[in-house]
A protein has these predicted regions:
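Bacterial Sec-dependent N-terminal signal peptides
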Residues: 1-32
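Short acidic-aromatic linear motifs embedded in glycine-rich loops, typified by GG[WY][YF]DAGD(H)
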Residues: 24-146, 150-192
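Conserved small/polar residues in nucleotide/adenosyl-binding loops
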Residues: 202-207
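Acidic, proline/serine/threonine- and glycine-rich low-complexity intrinsically disordered segments
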Residues: 198-199
Length: 207
């Protein structure tokens, strides 16, 4: 009789445990990536995100950055117009000095385009991601204006070297897996983008 009661007790206990396990909703936590749902959340997050995406292209670090000494925008512009030359000798800079570049020289000639055109898209996504963060609205508007000004200035630098640029809209950027090939803007569209983007920043500074 005692064994029977013990068996019933054990079976009942196991049943309760199994019910508890089945009713437990497991939610996974992602630790290896940062998504818009978890970042940015605070004013500090926004500041860091804006600093990283609005200002990082305009720097010089060794052979990186738009203003680097080896193949930045200033060096390419100066050498292509005979205003400057490279004291290191011909080598990869010779095509610029003598306007004799070929497809094989693309890596150096197109460095700002291939490495920093995407910066415009990063700034567009950053504007979208910070817009609804709960923070001081005046400061938020300032950050958005800084991003737009940076977009306009980056577009100007690239247009000066390569002509009309490619600007992806937000919907395309949010559906990057569709792999849509975008055309360049027209001359007029590029001009308008360059002129109107910094306006928000200058207007904010004036007030």
């Amino acid at each position: 009789m005692k064994m029977k009661k013990l068996n019933i007790y054990i079976i009942g206990l196991l049943t309760l445990m199994l019910c508890g396990i089945q009713s437990c909703a497991l939610e996974s936590e992602v630790f290896d990536e940062i998504t818009p749902s978890i970042y940015p959340q605070t004013e500090r997050d926004v500041r860091d995100l804006v600093t990283g995406n609005a200002y990082s292209p305009f720097q010089n670090y060794d052979y990186g950055g738009l203003y680097n000494v080896a193949n930045g925008v200033m060096l390419i512009s100066d050498m292509a117009t005979e205003y400057g030359f490279c004291s290191w000798g011909g080598w990869i800079w010779e095509p610029l000095e003598f306007a004799r570049w070929t497809p094989s020289d693309e890596d150096r000639i197109a460095y700002p385009w291939t490495n920093y055109l995407k910066g415009i898209s990063k700034m567009t996504l950053t504007i979208d991601r910070i817009t609804n963060v709960n923070m001081n609205k005046d400061l938020l508007n300032q950050y958005i204006a800084e991003l737009r000004c940076a977009r306009g200035f980056l577009a100007f630098l690239l247009y000066d070297l390569y002509g009309p640029i490619i600007v992806a809209d937000l919907e395309t950027l949010k559906n990057a897996e569709d792999e849509i090939i975008l055309p360049r803007l027209s001359e007029e569209e590029t001009h308008n983008f360059i002129v109107t983007e910094p306006v928000s920043y200058t207007h904010l500074r004036a007030h």
